[in-house]
Amino acid sequence: MTDIISPFSLAEEQNYAQPKIGQQVELNGSQLGQYVHIADNAIIEETQIGDYSYTAGNNQIFYATIGKFVSIATYVRINPGNHPTYQRVAQHHFTYRSSAYGLGEDDQDFFDWRREHHVTVGNDVWIGHNAVLMPGVTVGNGAVIGTSAVVTKDVGPYSIVAGVAAKKIGMRFDDNMIARIEKSQWWNWDHETLKERMPDFRDLAVFAEKYL
């Protein structure tokens, strides 16, 4: 993980590896990998984002681990805050953000409860526009989350899900190809290897023949 720089813009080649941060971005207790881009209007709290991943703007991400090469479209929400629906007489956040209303100290135990519902997103995941990943879910490597999907359950590797609540509608590859890709762990290749093999990434058959 590296320090962040601002604003979000194309940098000189020697600075490509530095995370690029847009305007009106709040980062609290978070870590960003190399080549990460965070576009405008985002709140990211207690989250780790892996190398080469990006957000497209207007995003909220809380208490999450995001893998490498993850594509996060506009208006995606990851781990929106649960309210105490069953535990308390009132659902309103005055019961745990009490200081904002002059009603005493905040309830730190409640925020610890939220942290326990961590979200994990694997590598090379594509999360479509306006999708929501609910607290506690895990999304496997290579998965696709459709536009406006609400993910309430774990999503398997290379699965394609869509809908409210999200359901599996297909797979990107067959089991054999998935196993070969997983074995390669290409997302862990160093930058020079990625650069050298970039043309091969653009053709699945060529890539599979050479590296899988």
Q: Model features per residue range: what roles?
A:
Residues 8-9, 15-32, 37-135, 164:
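Flexible, glycine/small-residue-enriched loop-and-beta-strand segment within the central core
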Residues 112, 117, 185-199:
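Leloir-type glycosyltransferase catalytic cores
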Residues 145, 163:
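Conserved G/P- and acidic residue-centered "switch" motifs that form tight phosphate/ATP-binding loops
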Residues 164-173, 178:
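Short, charge-rich, low-complexity interaction segments located
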Residues 193-212:
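ABC ATPase nucleotide-binding domains
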